[in-house]
């Protein structure tokens, strides 16, 4: 995972995401309902649900809305028949792309996902074609703090790895099941958590140039525009120099 900055590579997408907040809320509620259905409504015992709640709160969703979604999931309402489906493929520049979807109609979902790859010079692969390049991890972002103190607190809490970033922030990696407990330990030590989520971390990355990077971003945007797509993971690496040209 050395050198990989997942957060740096998504900053440029924040504005586009904010512009479609209604769609984001729909996806967040869908994830809350599904997480509660699968793992129960106790946030402390359900890492997926806690991650979904944290993400919803960071997008300014109200507690009432979150609680209603959880109640629907636990109660088994009409909208809880969603299933998680992962699609794998190759994007511009040979990048590996994983698309996490929640859907009650696989045919509808694939009819949205496949053309996105095709239009951007990529292709949808078979199950397992790129999945082996990713590991499911918990990822915590700390905006600033004393490195030694954070390292001690994170290790004590059960973190796997702590990586300082050039801007003074820190990325803390955990087993995905331990995300909540590690987060609690770091917060108890006095550090402010900027973001925390369960994500997919690539074992290797592909450096993208100024010609290829926009094509990958176009693919990501097209996929995230699909109603059934919850998350898009990739192993493309965009340097600060290339990002400045976009």
UniProtKB/Swiss-Prot annotation:
Q: Does the keyword Transcription regulation apply?
A: yes
Q: Which UniProt keywords apply?
A: Cytoplasm, DNA-binding, Transcription, Transcription regulation
Concerning SUPFAM superfamilies, the annotation shows: YebC-like
Which Gene Ontology CC terms are recorded? cytosol
**What GO terms are given for molecular function?**
DNA binding
- Establish whether keyword Ribonucleoprotein is in the entry: no
One GO biological-process annotation of the entry reads: regulation of DNA-templated transcription
| Xref: Pfam families | TACO1_YebC_N, Transcrip_reg
Q: Which domain of life is it from?
A: Bacteria
> Where does it reside?
Cytoplasm
- So what family is this one in? Belongs to the TACO1 family.
- Which NCBIfam families does this entry report, sorted A to Z? PRK00110.1, PRK12378.1, YebC/PmpR family DNA-binding transcriptional regulator
Name of the protein: Probable transcriptional regulatory protein APJL_1171
Source organism of the structure: Actinobacillus pleuropneumoniae serotype 3 (strain JL03)
